[in-house]
Amino acid sequence: GQIEQIFTNYFAGQGLASAPTDFDGRSDYGPFIEAGIPAGGLFSGAEGIKTAQEAAIYGGTAGEPYDACYHQACDSIQAPNNNLSDQALAELGDAAAHAIWTLGKTSTGFYADGSRMAASQAVSLDQFDYRGGQLVR
């Protein structure tokens, strides 16, 4: 989609390798896309195993998990267990900032009519009982 293309173009422009990943609802973006809100993001690996080709492109060790600490007690940015890659954080953080900037300054939306919201997904707040944590009806 359009968000993925923003990231792809950014990485290419920076001379950085990148690869698409499945956008399958596994993460916290599911409710956004269910509500018709465009979503996209970055992925640096989880419990998958790095291939020899990926190790040659991105570094690391073939046959090892992308993130051996994924959802484990050692998954921390606190010493002594800091398993955060400063390089990955810088590259992905810059890509995210670029995407936010690109989307924020555009005058067109994601839909065929140029809008920022799909007409079929438009919802009036008047039909909800709550606004934030406040009961309004």
Question: Can you say where each PLM-predicted feature lies in the sequence?
Answer:
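Secretory-pathway/membrane protein signature
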Residues: G1-R137
